Amino acid sequence: MLRIVDVTSETTDDLRCAVPRADFDVDAAMAAVIPVCSAVRDRGVEALREYSEKFDHVVPEHLRVPVEALATAAANLDGTLRRAFSESIRRRRQVCQEAEVETSSQPVEVAGGARVSQRIVPVGRVGLYVPGGFAPLASSVIMNVVPAQEAGVSSIAVASPPQAEFGGLPHPSILALCHLLGVNEVYAVGGAQAIAMFAYGVEGSDEADSCPRVDMVTGPGNIYVVAAKRCLRGTVGIDSEAGPTEIAILADETADPRHIAADLMSQAEHDTLAAAVLVTDSTTLAEAVQRELAPMVSATLHSERIRTSLTSKQSAIVMVRDIDQGLEVVNAYAAEHLEIQTADAAAVAARVWNAGAIFVGPWAPVSLGDYSAGSTHVLPTAGAACHSSGLSVRSFMRAVHVIDYTEDALLELADSVEAFALAENLPGHANAITVRRSR
């Protein structure tokens, strides 16, 4: 089912091209998204209602979901699911509190009377997008809201597409999680128009049809959501331009082929453009994984979607000489999710530099991270893991340098600053120092 790519004779420079990504042309989607963003900017609520009818086939009574609907959704939660939600929230919050929070620095005295410090401050207001396409990704509520709360964001809004099945409200699981997390500002708006609503703000006849603009938008979405983020960055801050999900697994002969097959399928289930890549030095393992995949795919609910993903160009089994070359491949690929299923997996994982998240050993599948590991599942895709990080508390915080100099400290450095400014042909900069010299 998965094609075989043999790189055993390839050089390091060629490894980045071993497995191409799926075609995900955000620029092409911009042609459809720009008019949507412009319409929301110019016509506000009227445009949002038109796009709800066009794309979601339902028009909610109000843009903002009533608080009572959030409470009702939480009250109707199945007990097992409520416990699963609560445990996921607890673990994600603990990791945020103990591993991700940055604090302001003590002032650094670079000279007598010359102090510089760094103040860490949260973003003021954020809009968090939760998709509802192939599946209602309720887990994205946790992954976006919890780090924003732990960062100290004072105003949090959530948007998710209205569902005809639920009377124009977002999926009940999404509403229930918002209630459990204490988020009361929830909008039944989806797609690119939701990103535009957050970026520009809209004002209706009352609060139920109004949304103040935000400072930053985060959360996953389809290609049109990504295009809207690209279109509106600068008007509003964004977390990333995330593409289709991807999993890479570095494995040797000690790995269980059934585990490998199940994990590859788990991410292929998301999208026909999802990437599933096994990197191994074991022909025996590769053949066993192929045998396991066929019946698993046929028996699962989303078999056609998974089969399309696994047989497309973005998915493959990559054969390498040894685990050392396998590490070169996965570091060049920079997967969103990377599993290490080898002997001495922790030591191998320590040699990985480029990955959105690393899952170590046979008992840490990507599905665990998708829901309840305590880690984030909003991760860089398409190779961006070589320079970008997943969504965390730090994503919602800003570092502000505070410069505090006395008069003597400035005058001690005046000659240097004036010389620097004049060397750059910026006499106005120099003059701002000169006018402060004693007359």
Swiss-Prot record:
Keyword NAD listed: yes
Residues holding Zn(2+): Q267, H270, D370, H429
Annotated residues for binding of substrate: T245, Q267, H270, H337, D370, E424, H429
Secretion signal, residue range per the UniProt entry: none
Highest rank taxon of the organism: Bacteria
E.C. code: 1.1.1.23
Pathway membership: Amino-acid biosynthesis; L-histidine biosynthesis; L-histidine from 5-phospho-alpha-D-ribose 1-diphosphate: step 9/9
Function, in words: Catalyzes the sequential NAD-dependent oxidations of L-histidinol to L-histidinaldehyde and then to L-histidine.
Protein name from the UniProt record: Histidinol dehydrogenase
Encoding gene (name): hisD
